[in-house]
From Swiss-Prot:
Residues 571-605 form the SAP domain. Single-stranded DNA-dependent ATP-dependent helicase that plays a key role in DNA non-homologous end joining (NHEJ) by recruiting DNA-PK to DNA. Required for double-strand break repair and V(D)J recombination. Also has a role in chromosome translocation. Has a role in chromosome translocation. The DNA helicase II complex binds preferentially to fork-like ends of double-stranded DNA in a cell cycle-dependent manner. It works in the 3'-5' direction. This is X-ray repair cross-complementing protein 6. The modification N-acetylserine is found at S2. GO terms for cellular component: chromosome; cytoplasm; DNA-dependent protein kinase complex; DNA-dependent protein kinase-DNA ligase 4 complex; Ku70:Ku80 complex; nonhomologous end joining complex; nucleus. Keywords: Acetylation, Activator, ADP-ribosylation, ATP-binding, Chromosome, Cytoplasm, DNA damage, DNA recombination, DNA repair, DNA-binding, Helicase, Hydrolase, Immunity, Innate immunity, Isopeptide bond, Lyase, Methylation, Multifunctional enzyme, Nucleotide-binding, Nucleus, Phosphoprotein, Transcription, Transcription regulation, Ubl conjugation. Residues 1-11, 537-557 have a biased composition (Basic and acidic residues). The gene is Xrcc6. It is found in: Nucleus; Chromosome; Cytoplasm. Residues 259-466 form the Ku domain. SUPFAM superfamilies: SAP domain, SPOC domain-like, vWA-like. Residues 576-581 are annotated as: Interaction with BAX.
Amino acid sequence: MSEWESYYKTEGEEEEEEEESPDTGGEYKYSGRDSLIFLVDASRAMFESQGEDELTPFDMSIQCIQSVYTSKIISSDRDLLAVVFYGTEKDKNSVNFKNIYVLQDLDNPGAKRVLELDQFKGQQGKKHFRDTVGHGSDYSLSEVLWVCANLFSDVQLKMSHKRIMLFTNEDDPHGRDSAKASRARTKASDLRDTGIFLDLMHLKKPGGFDVSVFYRDIITTAEDEDLGVHFEESSKLEDLLRKVRAKETKKRVLSRLKFKLGEDVVLMVGIYNLVQKANKPFPVRLYRETNEPVKTKTRTFNVNTGSLLLPSDTKRSLTYGTRQIVLEKEETEELKRFDEPGLILMGFKPTVMLKKQHYLRPSLFVYPEESLVSGSSTLFSALLTKCVEKKVIAVCRYTPRKNVSPYFVALVPQEEELDDQNIQVTPGGFQLVFLPYADDKRKVPFTEKVTANQEQIDKMKAIVQKLRFTYRSDSFENPVLQQHFRNLEALALDMMESEQVVDLTLPKVEAIKKRLGSLADEFKELVYPPGYNPEGKVAKRKQDDEGSTSKKPKVELSEEELKAHFRKGTLGKLTVPTLKDICKAHGLKSGPKKQELLDALIRHLEKN
């Protein structure tokens, strides 16, 4: 049966794209723009390194910010970024507060902004900062946060996330000035109430950085984070980059759904996408004259009168046999509606029953939403703990949205894991694994199995043991994508040529040969015949009768049977391979299609 389609094709294609796009290949889209302000302490202590070869805390901060800028240019160029220095000699801000310097207002990342940050790196950057901005000490953190709040309020665009990242190595910025400290805490609380998150990226200082002195009451802890867990101070650029990446990564919920455990037991959960295949960004159409992005708009017209059709004027149809059935849009939507959006618990199964071959697509992640239904976190945590203890999975029916077919899914419990920096490596919650239906399973045609003898098995075991290494999925990047992004980066920053990417997916041939030694040759001697050359040309098999011409195809039908089919008009019931063999046997020329074979054969039989 054909699919429901629009009575006017163009309208249907446009709506089909809109309806189906969220569920294709696990790609998910979000509304609104992320906005992020980098707030950097510019006091003298930030420009002092702990050792001769070590970077200064200010240098680490600038390099980290620059790294985020370049990645945003490639992946999220619509997001808004800003850089603000505080503790400066000169001031530059909209409210004329002292010792606060707004280097860059909230705007899209671009090449000029990255190059401007590049001027503050290294010894030359230190001198440039001293000449253009200078160092100060008499600042108020409440005024600094006020300036950041004004930067957010000056933006007229819709923002999905507002975040401030504070880089400093001073754990008690106001010392004994309790009035300034109190005002800073009050202002931080005001920002929290307006949906602005403040994250601390604290750097190493002599004697250690104590978060509890001042910043514990200042920084924002998200609902899904533990108040008692704080990052350790960063002494290396790699540690700081990891912290920034962990905080800067978008934590956007795909949907918020009801999770029904029974008739009267319901909690609210959020569905998150943790892993998604990286693809090249879609090309953007530009207007030739101004180089501005253009938007495509589709209009539907009546083919007879040429008048513009409104959405209410169009119908959807299905051709069933020779009859065209026309339905209203609401009726087709009703046909697609199986259930209300949500998760419904069907039962529990042992974890061992979930097999690797059940994999269909990347899993999603389920986490409680306490803000919508009070008590969801407690009930969710109890369910997670019991599933881990009993080693079971929850089998559920999952309906992501209206007008979407339900899926059967398995909720696999997952415990939280932290690394040595107290950064969350694995979140605690449920992995939502999509289960296959019966028609998703296929029979794979295997080649003939050749059994190896014990000596060959032992030799291969030794080879595998020599080539073992610890696998990390993030150690292997897609070389095509990485080179594409490097080329974009070179274009954006006006570089002469892009940096060449090392393809880490290629085998390290020299290292493999060094590890294996003579094992590879010994294995070849055990498996392959003497003198075997895998790179040599395969010798053609000799014909049974060298003097004869090519063999005639084997025809299973006799002449009488063929003529009987012709008289009854049942030649069309013969398969394409059979028709090809008959045509070859009679020396008939025809195309590869069945109708062409039939036409040639019928003409031949009519003549004879």
